[in-house]
Amino acid sequence: MALSCTLNRYLLLMAQEHLEFRLPEIKSLLLLFGGQFASSQETYGKSPFWILSIPSEDIARNLMKRTVCAKSIFELWGHGQSPEELYSSLKNYPVEKMVPFLHSDSTYKIKIHTFNKTLTQEEKIKRIDALEFLPFEGKVNLKKPQHVFSVLEDYGLDPNCIPENPHNIYFGRWIADGQRELIESYSVKKRHFIGNTSMDAGLSFIMANHGKVKENDIVFDPFVGTGGLLIACAHFGAYVYGTDIDYNTVHGLGKATRKNQKWRGPDENIRANLRQYGLEKYYLDVLVSDASKPSWRKGTYFDAIITDPPYGIRESTRRTGSQKEIPKGIEKWEKCPESHVPVSLSYHLSDMFLDLLNFAAETLVLGGRLVYWLPVYTPEYTEEMVPWHPCLELVSNCEQKLSSHTSRRLITMEKVKKFENRDQYSHLLSDHFLPYQGHNSFREKYFSGVTKRIAKEEKSTQE
């Protein structure tokens, strides 16, 4: 409790997109920069206005240099459910905290921001004039002010029922904006090398933030594909490395994904993507490799593992192997010839994710994070289906809906215990293991007549 007295209150203006991902992102970034999530607000839900307590303005600025879920942050001077409550709150704010930004040598500007309602210019001016009791001594400068102050009004979430008066009103000093522009500047549409399942730029940055990726980290993606997740991590200064079982994807060969382009060009590869954004210096390597048979020496190499495993829908789930474990004509003690190309077999989802967790537990540094997508069949989903490992602690579990009956969940886990050989078999002793095996049939359920029937029934019910 004593700590909370030393914290300053800030107002976060959140983007109304990927709502479930916002809280874990902010919590992860605050931990990354030496803060801790503290708030008197009971629930967050869909509201774009969050009141947080943060130790310093430097941490608030660092937070905004990373977040793609928040638009802006303000030092909160006052708030209330009516103009009168706001003015009373402002009058109780310590004058000594205001003075450095209101003195005669400074310039300032006041902005009005409304959520779910549009005000006329006359209404905006009226709200600004009502703040004349504040000790502003500087000059107004609308083009390049030294300090920007904002009145933010919340009119609720229902666009079909907009109240006459706001539910909440806030006043604060603008500190910084978030990194929402990265979503556009790193858009997949503008990218040199893409595939069928290239990750959306916004989600890539969210995953990097959930993983607490920072400068000089080593980040690994065992299902690298076209490397979209590596780009986001490299943007934050991490060195990136990946593997994939698909030779053509790793080497940029084969048919193109883009419309009106039949074959991939000579320079379509992951390294070229990093070069496109000026991030080539963070590229370590990308190899053709089977995630079910990692070729790593024992040790902890990675600060984070950020990945999007294939679900068997648009990309197949494969691993190397053979019905005959040894190629014909090769004795047990002999190595396979260089010309031998391993046969690929189907790779059950439950096996894939358990292998991924074992690999993360073995190769992550203590405190390192694993961030990955888990596809689920919504009608049968339970929290017990999320794979677990004794060395990994679940940090967050966020849902992104894909359809009325399917979704994928962004799972973030942190390594909290040193890996021991017996840990890789722990799941077999757990009651959680049996329901999780249902993921083997995710693809069948996705394409099944059951799925189509559910969609048809939902449609007829709505009619």
Curated annotation (Swiss-Prot):
PROSITE patterns: N6_MTASE (PS00092), SAM_MT_TRM11 (PS51627). GO terms for cellular component: cytoplasm; mitochondrion; tRNA (m2G10) methyltransferase complex. GO terms for biological process: methylation; tRNA processing. The modification N-acetylalanine is found at residue 2. Coiled coil: none annotated. One of its GO terms (molecular function) is tRNA (guanine(10)-N2)-methyltransferase activity. Its EC number is 2.1.1.214. InterPro entries: DNA_methylase_N6_adenine_CS, RlmKL-like_Mtase, SAM-dependent_MTases_sf, tRNA_mtfrase_TRM11. Keywords: Acetylation, Cytoplasm, Methyltransferase, RNA-binding, S-adenosyl-L-methionine, Transferase, tRNA processing, tRNA-binding. It is an enzyme of class 2 (transferase). It catalyses: guanosine(10) in tRNA + S-adenosyl-L-methionine = N(2)-methylguanosine(10) in tRNA + S-adenosyl-L-homocysteine + H(+). It is found in: Cytoplasm. Belongs to the class I-like SAM-binding methyltransferase superfamily. TRM11 methyltransferase family. Part of the heterodimeric TRMT11-TRM112 methyltransferase complex; this complex forms an active tRNA methyltransferase, where TRMT112 acts as an activator of the catalytic subunit TRMT11. PANTHER family: RNA METHYLASE-RELATED, TRNA (GUANINE(10)-N2)-METHYLTRANSFERASE HOMOLOG. Catalytic subunit of the TRMT11-TRM112 methyltransferase complex, that specifically mediates the S-adenosyl-L-methionine-dependent N(2)-methylation of guanosine nucleotide at position 10 (m2G10) in tRNAs. This is one of the major tRNA (guanine-N(2))-methyltransferases. This is tRNA (guanine(10)-N(2))-methyltransferase TRMT11. The gene is TRMT11.
